[in-house]
Regions:
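Glycine- (often His-adjacent) and acidic-residue-rich active-site loop
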Residues: 62-95, 114, 142-144
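CoA-thioester-processing core
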Residues: 95, 115-168, 196-198
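Amphipathic alpha-helical segments at domain termini/boundaries
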Residues: 2-27, 169-205
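A short, small-residue-rich loop immediately preceding and capping a beta-strand
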Residues: 103-113
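Short, well-ordered beta-strand core segments
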Residues: 106, 128-129, 188
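Hydrophobic/aromatic residues within transmembrane alpha-helices
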Residues: 22, 61, 73, 121-123, ...
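Conserved CoA-thioester-binding segment of acyl-CoA-metabolizing enzymes
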Residues: 1-62, 97
Length: 205
């Protein structure tokens, strides 16, 4: 049974009451989803999935106060060849699908910036709780990029095609209040991790 897992420069996993908390911890603080990070996350989820038959536990994914995740490393993407970019897209999709198909509830506890592939990560979770200062966006279009990690499918299903196009094509950034209004997040809490834990306790009582 995993009580504490730490992958230097990427994330650590700890137990807290009814849930496991996976906290992104990149050294620069923006929680970029590099290829190495995505692969490490996928491996960690596979290990946790193997344990679910013994002790099913929900998972809370969080970042830090200022950044949930800014998504992929743009410098890394710029250096990719065509085949490498295709493979990186497939690697990211594998992670997002592992989260979406996880056998226990997965909640994104979002503070600060949740952008690009970071938003894809949040969209793959089953629920999203945001801090009042959270900011959401998919600014790839402004950079000549489009996500390959499933966000173009999950976001329209969640908030509708028109609103999703506003976020994708206009590279619009929205507040937590607006995200709640359009259904992108399920709740706002000053401490999203604590809010997620409260929801899980209430659901199990």
């Amino acid at each position: 049974m995993v009580h504490h897992v730490s992958v230097p420069f990427f994330f650590h996993i700890t137990d807290d009451g009814p849930a496991r908390i996976l906290r992104l911890t990149s050294p620069e603080g923006t929680n970029r989803l590099t290829r190495a990070c995505v692969l490490a996350l996928t491996a960690a989820l596979a290990e946790l999935r193997d344990e679910l038959n013994k002790q099913p536990r929900p998972l809370i994914i969080a970042g830090n106060r200022h950044f949930f995740s800014v998504g992929a490393d743009l410098n890394e993407i710029a250096a990719l060849t065509g085949p490498e970019a295709y493979e990186f897209s497939a690697v990211g999709q594998t992670l997002m699908n592992a989260i979406a198909s996880y056998l226990a509830p997965v909640i994104a506890a979002i503070e600060g910036h949740c952008m690009g592939g970071g938003l894809d990560l949040a969209l793959a979770c089953h629920r999203r709780i945001a801090a009042p200062h959270a900011v959401f966006g998919h600014r790839g279009a402004a950079l000549g990029l489009m996500t390959g990690w499933g966000g173009t499918q999950r976001l329209p299903r969640l908030i509708g095609k028109g609103r999703a196009l506003d976020l994708f094509i206009a590279a619009e950034k929205i507040s937590a209040a607006r995200a709640l209004e359009i259904g992108l997040v399920d709740a706002i809490a000053s401490d999203p991790v604590a809010g997620a834990l409260r929801q899980l306790v209430a659901a199990s009582s």
